[in-house]
Amino acid sequence: MAKKLEAQGGRGGEEWDDGGAYENVKKVYVGQGDSGVVYVKFDYEKDGKIVSHEHGKQTLLGTEEFVVDPEDYITSVKIYYEKLFGSPIEIVTALIFKTFKGKTSQPFGLTSGEEAELGGGKIVGFHGSSSDLIHSVGVYIIPSTTPLTPPVSGGLTKLEAQGGRGGDVWDDGGAYDNVKKVYVGQGDSGVVYVKFDYEKDGKIVSLEHGKQTLLGTEEFEIDPEDYITYVKVYYEKLFGSPIEIVTALIFKTFKGKTSQPFGLTSGEEAELGGGKIVGFHGTSSDLIHSLGAYIIPSSTPLTPSSNTIPAQGGDGGVAWDDGVHDSVKKIYVGQGDSCVTYFKADYEKASKPVLGSDHGKKTLLGAEEFVLGPDEYVTAVSGYYDKIFSVDAPAIVSLKFKTNKRTSIPYGLEGGTEFVLEKKDHKIVGFYGQAGEYLYKLGVNVAPIAK
């Protein structure tokens, strides 16, 4: 039986309820007006037939659409809402939909005001309230039991290519040990060329696809003992053409290294990940139309256990590890409405500064900084983690840092489950954890304090 999640937004208008007795949502239509979202329509699948329900009122601006691919389904919807100027009634200002396979819609509307997210399973129905505007949206969900794709062999999984259906199919396979280097070439309209250096039995195997232009290529090199864990793919249709192309690619590794965006981050957005990426496949012509990946389970320990304090928090987001350095020099903490959303640390190694990687996502509140002085080092981190409304996993809600000379202010609101990361006669020389939209988990790497 489907679970009904409370509608998020305002209390204006009349309630509507499509129910949760459908098998899937196949297509979403969203219409906008001067002030926000004024119209929604959902195409549901039931016994092989399409059942459509619409709410609100269309304007001359028409509607925009989000089509759910075969064998995929919506897992979350992000809802933005705020009060109309001079009115006590909130309306929905924007909607963003995300699917099980990582496909994300464009923002339908302006992402302003309050923000809420509904999900935690397969969405099979919607409810809410509306007048000539959409005031609120809620969902019906059922548990998600669908595997990404059947395992190919030995734990290898082939993730479906994301993007358009143009060009010829290519497949590098997933029989490699690692991806060592990525080359991306851009053209006038998007990504036109990719090349991957794979490692196999200590040798490099290079495979290329698409066609280079005079603009050449940009590169993303993977550090030793690191590997790519996910790729973000942006794609959209060429002007005047029904065929989508990849407009940008972003790569991220197990240890938190993130590439620059190779291209313009416009159009639809999808993510490929969930393990160690060991191969790619896709489609191309003189352009790159789609990109998929082969993954295997990640079994690499974050750091040697004898010098690691286990991470505390919830099991969400993507794993990252800054590694081991000589000392921590600066810490950045960014907060959102309910929890810590961003974390970064700068280090020193061999008397040289090491700029850290960003983990999580900054909000409009920015980030606060904790700067360490000469001969100062971090000896402990304390904090709290808690379950946040509409977020599947518990997230870090507060952090506080203790050094050999002082203790920082608490960054965030103290409440929930308390934790302390500390080892006697040791100092913290690196951080690791898990992050996505929020900072879900934090652990530390430590080293003995020199006497």
Curated annotation (Swiss-Prot):
Subunit-level organization: Component of the PYK10 complex, at least composed of PYK10/BGLU23, BGLU21, BGLU22, JAL22, JAL23, PBP1/JAL30, PBP2/JAL31, JAL32, JAL33, JAL34, JAL35, GLL22 and GLL23.
GO molecular function: carbohydrate binding
Record domain Jacalin-type lectin: where: 2-143, 156-297, 306-448
GO cellular component: chloroplast; cytosol; nucleus; plant-type vacuole; plasmodesma
Name of this protein: Jacalin-related lectin 35
PANTHER family: JACALIN-RELATED LECTIN 3 (PTHR47293), JACALIN-RELATED LECTIN 35 (PTHR47293:SF64)
The keyword Repeat appears for this protein: yes
Superkingdom of origin: Eukaryota
Keyword Metal-binding set for record: no
GO terms classed as biological process: response to jasmonic acid; response to wounding; vegetative to reproductive phase transition of meristem
Modification sites for N-acetylalanine: 2
SMART domains: Jacalin
Gene: JAL35
Annotated organism of origin: Arabidopsis thaliana (Mouse-ear cress)
UniProt entry keywords in alphabetical sequence: Acetylation, Lectin, Repeat
